[in-house]
């Protein structure tokens, strides 16, 4: 199996396991109203029973949302929905992308406002492999060190086939906007939520803030 194929298989494995755990946690049925912030339809194809789904994403993601039954262009920090509009708000690896601490706080407040329950997953900052770049330890370096290194040395560029423009955008976004979280920071953002761990080889790979 080629490295890129192996990476794709592993990604689908973790995604399927996460979606099944989410569905069990909330008892998802065809009647459950779910808002997926930053998502695409492919995750939901992994569930045997799909909810009443609304996808919210940026206009840039329009091509990835082809075929989605209901999607809205918007910003997770300012959601265009009334309080309690959804049974569950779902977010998979999004909160670390919204910007600085103040932006993450706005995102967290909006999630808690429009969802009666929520599931917010994010990579663990203390997992030794940076999960966007698939590169060990680089996220523990100061940003001033990362800037000259990341564009040249990262595993992601070898495993994922994208256009040069998409690659440049992704790297710049990572360097400028991505802010990884640890357990204490996620708890502070969602003080009334339970925080659970997703482990890989005994190490906490990701964190989930969960409120039923």
Can you say where each PLM-predicted feature lies in the sequence?
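Short, glycine-/aromatic-enriched active-site segment of Class I SAM-dependent methyltransferases
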Residues: 133-136, 159-173
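Class I SAM-dependent methyltransferase Rossmann-like catalytic core
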Residues: 1-27
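Conserved S-adenosyl-L-methionine
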Residues: 192-202
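Short hydrophobic/aromatic beta-strand or adjacent loop that forms the aromatic wall/cage
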Residues: 178, 202-208
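Active-site rim elements
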Residues: 6-12, 169-177
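Conserved class I S-adenosyl-L-methionine
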Residues: 117-150
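Conserved SAM-binding loop
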Residues: 25-26, 32-127, 210-211
